[in-house]
């Protein structure tokens, strides 16, 4: 039984790709069900990836972030994920912040309670792609542990 998931620098973006140098979204992957090419159970049911209608956001949350592929409303819900809490985090020292907000946006839209944190916004800055090797890795794990204690019974 999975109660929660912690995702640091989530792979992505969902449904497509991003040119991180140009900070632009790439074309939709016609085989993607959302996060992967593996089939998901949605409510309303989808028989193929093309049944999951998506559109690019009009505007990103911040400068330097790409727009995300999101479902056309009303969004299909991920039925098997509805009782799982997700913590997703990004850091400023890598190329990931360009698209890291996209997966949490998709999950929340699909009915999965997902908290997204940019570590620099909570005073934990200067990390690279390998957070567990940074001098402030203890601060990172304390933050994540605090989230788990607060959000997982």
What does each model-identified segment do?
Residues 8, 106, 147-151:
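Structured segments of extracytoplasmic/periplasmic soluble domains
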Residues 122-126, 130-153:
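Catalytic active-site module of serine/aspartate enzymes centered on a nucleophile-bearing elbow/loop
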Residues 6-15:
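Active-site nucleophile loop of the alpha/beta-hydrolase fold
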Residues 17-109:
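The feature captures the conserved acid-bearing segment of alpha/beta-hydrolase catalytic domains
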Residues 91-95, 121, 128:
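Acidic beta-to-alpha connecting loop that harbors the catalytic carboxylate
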Residues 108-126:
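Catalytic histidine neighborhood in serine/cysteine hydrolases
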Residues 6, 87-90, 115-117:
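Hydrophobic/aromatic beta-strand patches that form the interior of the parallel beta-sheet core
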């Amino acid at each position: 039984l999975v109660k929660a998931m912690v995702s640091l620098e989530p792979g992505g973006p969902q449904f497509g790709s991003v040119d991180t140098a140009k900070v632009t979204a790439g074309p939709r992957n016609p085989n993607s069900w959302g996060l992967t090419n593996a089939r998901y159970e949605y409510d309303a049911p989808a028989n193929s990836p093309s049944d999951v209608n998506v559109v690019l956001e009009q505007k990103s949350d911040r400068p330097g972030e790409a727009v995300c592929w999101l479902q056309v409303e009303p969004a299909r819900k991920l039925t098997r994920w509805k009782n799982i809490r997700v913590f997703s985090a990004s850091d400023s020292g890598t190329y990931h912040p360009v698209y890291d907000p996209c997966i949490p946006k998709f999950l929340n839209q699909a009915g999965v309670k997902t908290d997204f944190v940019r570590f620099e916004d909570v005073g934990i800055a200067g990390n690279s792609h390998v957070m567990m090797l940074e001098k402030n890795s203890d601060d990172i794990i304390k933050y994540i542990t605090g989230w788990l204690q607060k959000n997982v019974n």
